[in-house]
A protein has these predicted regions:
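Extended, low-polarity transmembrane helix blocks
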Residues: 1-31, 38, 47-55, 59, ...
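Flexible, solvent-exposed coil segments and beta strand-coil junctions
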Residues: 43-44
Length: 129
């Protein structure tokens, strides 16, 4: 039996899990800037876009974590994740890349579910309603 409290707790845990990979990813790219820029260039994306990628991942992850502007952040990160999947993991000859492709698609699905449900009571958005 689902209760509002259980739903809100599940949304909190979902936000924590979804945000972790983006906060860490943005942080790691900032601290290994040249390596990250090289990886982007190799994938056909200009390295000059790396600051935008870092901000999107790190700030977007923090927004999801605290649950502020959650719907906006969730739809933005869903789109970002799908674009990254197709630029960097669309290689069906490489099993590892295929796994990353489907992982990114699944993460985007999680963000779409978060977009549809909102952040829940245990969030900045939830405290404001």
């Amino acid at each position: 039996m689902q209760t509002p409290r259980l739903n809100d707790l599940a949304l909190l845990v979902a936000r924590m899990l979804l945000s972790a990979i983006f906060i860490k990813g943005g942080w790691d790219k900032a601290w290994a800037y040249q390596e990250a820029a090289g990886y982007m260039t190799k994938g056909g994306v200009p390295g000059s876009l790396l600051p935008l990628v870092i901000i999107t991942e790190f700030v977007g992850g923090l927004l999801i974590l605290v649950g502020w502007q959650t719907r906006c952040a969730a739809i933005a990160l869903a789109g970002f994740t799908l674009v990254a999947a197709f630029f960097f993991h669309w290689d069906f000859g490489n099993r590892g890349q295929v796994i990353h492709l489907y992982k990114n698609i699944a993460i985007a699905g999680g963000f779409l579910a978060l977009f549809a449900s909102a952040a829940g009571a245990y969030s900045v958005d939830g405290r404001r309603t």
